[in-house]
Amino acid sequence: EAIPKKIAELRKSIPNAGDQFKDIKWHLTGKVIFQQESSEIFDRESFVILICSFALVLTLLFSIYRSFGSVVLLMTPLVGGIGLNYGFMYLICNEINPVVMGATGVLLGLGTEYAEHLWGRIREELDNGASHEEALTRTYAQTGPPVLLGALTGMLAFLSLCLSRQSALIQLGYLGASGLAFTLISTLFLVPALAVIAAKRPKDYFPRIRVSFEFIARSFKVHPAAVVIVSTAVILASLYYASGISYERDLFKVFLARNMESTTSSEIISQKFHSDFSKPIYLSFDVEDVQEGLMVQRELDGIIEKLMDKYHQIASFDSISYLMSPDAIRKENAKAFNGVVESWPTLEQTFKEGLRNSSLSKNAAHVMQEAFDATKGLFSSLDTDKPLQDKNGFADLECSWYMTKIKDKYRFLTHVRYADDIKDPQQLKEVDARIMKAVRQLPVPVRISGTRQAMEEILSDLVSELFRLGSYAFAAVVLIFLIIFPQPRGVALCLIPMVGAFCITLGVLGLTKLGLPFSIVCVAPLIFGFGIHNGMHIVMGSLFEDKGSIEKATRRVTPRAMVTSLTIIMGFVSMLSSRLYPLEFLGAAMVIGMVASVPLTLITLPAVLLLLERRKKGSAPETHVPVAPQ
């Protein structure tokens, strides 16, 4: 809280905040300002992303249902669930990470999904002649279990993020899970109440999908074997391209918003002075004795100076050496100084004789004599037995920038700034390696650190973190399904859309060479949790529902699956406009994953079910008539 307050004070005090110095434009820049401006951008974007997601979902629902009353029935449980979750956030969180805003977009899509499946089944039962009470009873008895199971898998997907080593993802995990829980509770309790209210109205307000998706519902019956072969080929090709994924090398792109005024000002200044002053690296070492540390620091300074002269990649550096010298060096300097003081009378006599014999005017000779006397006075005022002291204490403050005591040791810090043209991530690594190789000759180990190094350490294990959290989510989903489903075949069939969608997502990311930010670890759990929802309705309707069939279940689920998939996609689309790369990337990855899950759920999965059904029928014993020998 202190840093934003201090920055606000600086902005008020700089000249361009007032009426004076109108011709001078001042800028605040540097690492702290980068982070502050990026946070301010997030604060502005949070509300915009929420409103855009809400508007996109609302527009989509209105274009599909074409009834304001139907949209109100669908959105009311959603608004109730999100409102409860924001109240929960307010009670338990002091700060919200930008990535957590992804949970809001997810809730806008998934929260609508629960209501869409329930209202869609109610509409179907009413069209078949059932009463309102019968429609509600059958809906909750047959469609309710898949909705509950889908919500449970979504919550497990979010909760798996709590096993991450990154605090932002942990926060996203429990807030996303709580949001799904609140939205589910709101939906299950409000839909019956809203249905009773709608039934009493003279006009039919029960939601009815006005867009036909019949061509998709029939697609799986046309060459199902070819559908399975093509889907398998696409998934295998995606796995091949997925092998090329790697984390984003432009680390400041990952952690800071793009197109910021502070970074633009920093780049202009860096180009002007040929030094990337805002992103220094730090070389540090620990010693037990200050004098030993000062001697090592002088050696380190010499190594850096040689690297500067030889490679021209280091623009400048600062260390304690320009403020303090080792006692041994000071004694040598004092000895040389005392020699000058002792020989001063001889030097003064020689100077006066030379001045007398010169052809200088009296005025010029007088000026030179005054300068010589001033130099004598300066030497006389120096005390070589005591170090220079700053009466205002600023020297002590400045020394603390380069040397501090940590427990029983003293840590020395050297600030190193690279040239402004050293921007390529690989080139930066090479310069780091060259410095570390050069300092190996020092008697103490030297460490390298800085903002870039810290960012790189966070991102370096992204891929392993992705598969670790993904495996947790996968195992949790499979376990839940094995407990609920009466046979493993149903579990395997439900996994087809989510596993295929995840593989295709990674393949597209690898093919497009998109660098992975830390938000990538959300992708596997979310796709595993959400990609399975619609598949459950098809599998349960085909295999485990009374008088169910593949064609009947697919025809029933397809319209609702298309609407729910589109609403989930709309929840993520608004993130594509974000200036924060992790949010933008999460939106893009989830859109790819959800788009991929649609054909896998509505075409590939029914095709697999149809082939299994035909194989089962074809395996029945046949009667063979013996042929008489000729």
Kindly give the residue locations of the regions a language model identified.
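Structural beta->alpha junctions
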Residues: 1, 30-35, 255-259, 284-293, ...
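Extracytoplasmic
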Residues: 1, 5, 37-40, 315-416
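A short beta-strand structural signal in non-transmembrane regions
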Residues: 1-15, 280-286, 400-435
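Membrane-embedded transmembrane helical bundles of large multi-pass transporters/channels
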Residues: 5-8, 12-255, 423, 430-433, ...
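Solvent-exposed, non-transmembrane loop/terminal regulatory segments of multi-pass membrane proteins
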Residues: 217-218, 225, 243-289, 295, ...
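Generic recognition of flexible, low-complexity loop/linker segments
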Residues: 267-272, 282, 302-307, 320, ...
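A structural signal for short secondary-structure junctions
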Residues: 273-278, 309-312, 395, 403-410, ...
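Soluble catalytic regions of membrane-associated enzymes that act on cell-envelope
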Residues: 282-341
